[in-house]
């Protein structure tokens, strides 16, 4: 299976206020969903000091992009995980991955982030063999069309 790098962007609203959330979702990954190998969802959330629109400042944004790049490369190198979504706004960015193995993902995460100073990250995992979160995110793309 070849993993492409095609993404869509959409706008959503935060659940507790009217701040916008920018959503980026990966498309063309159906073979990975159908494989049944990526049953665990991992959400990595970075809370930040938000500007008046709920977005990170330039310095934080650049660091987030750097972290995102190395995480994507590390997790997808041997298809340990598939990076599927990014939510940014209302004082936090969340990266969503679907993985084959949570313990291996955790080890790779620690190894990949070791060169960085401690980051304000929280990790949430959940079994999601039907890719429900991903499918809900894709509904945002359909609403924008």
Predicted features along the sequence, with ranges:
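Charge-rich, low-complexity segments
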Residues: 1-84, 100-106, 134-140, 144
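A short, structural micro-pattern
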Residues: 36-38, 91, 117
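A short beta-turn/loop motif at secondary-structure boundaries
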Residues: 85-90
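Short cationic amphipathic helices and targeting signals
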Residues: 93-98
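Helical (often loop-to-helix) elements that flank the catalytic cores of nucleotide-handling enzymes
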Residues: 103-118
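Conserved short beta-strand edge segments in small beta-sheet-based binding/regulatory domains
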Residues: 114-145
